[in-house]
């Protein structure tokens, strides 16, 4: 009959400090069908990050060579570092029927939507500017200049929220995760997603 359905694309965007990474990890744990899109980046690894698992860490020169060769489905410069999503690896996963989860910024989301022409795009929002600033300070990893830059970038990113398919305010982690989970399940039930399953059912009638 063929596989149950085709792979889907789920894209999460959020200002830094909104809780996107926590939500992403929970989704990957609950749904083994997900494959996480491992981005390439020129930034330095943070404590605990593993090359090839969290990111592919490369030099600026190597990144630019890959970009110019058409290697990326999307790429962007964020906070002075480059990030990019490998195109072929993404298409291979989707062809295998895997669902692919992206954790990218709004620039990348625009490019990815144009490149792949598919998927559910979800924007994770902080409850307020004050709460976002509190979370950034509580992390204890950024200096004042970096915090100010992240807040300024957050304001720009929030203006892009209307371009997304769904918005989730993360003022309560459990509720935010329930909403994200529902958005994913809704996408898996869409006619576009289940076209492979329908093709398999109809094949026997066409013989």
Curated annotation (Swiss-Prot):
SUPFAM superfamilies: P-loop containing nucleoside triphosphate hydrolases. It holds the Pfam family Guanylate_kin. It comes from the Bacteria. GO terms for cellular component: cytosol. Residues 7-185 form the Guanylate kinase-like domain. ATP binds at residues 14-21. It is found in: Cytoplasm. The keyword Membrane does not apply. Its EC number is 2.7.4.8. PANTHER family: GUANYLATE KINASE (PTHR23117:SF13), GUANYLATE KINASE-RELATED (PTHR23117). HAMAP family: Guanylate_kinase. This is Guanylate kinase. It comes from Nitratidesulfovibrio vulgaris (strain ATCC 29579 / DSM 644 / CCUG 34227 / NCIMB 8303 / VKM B-1760 / Hildenborough).
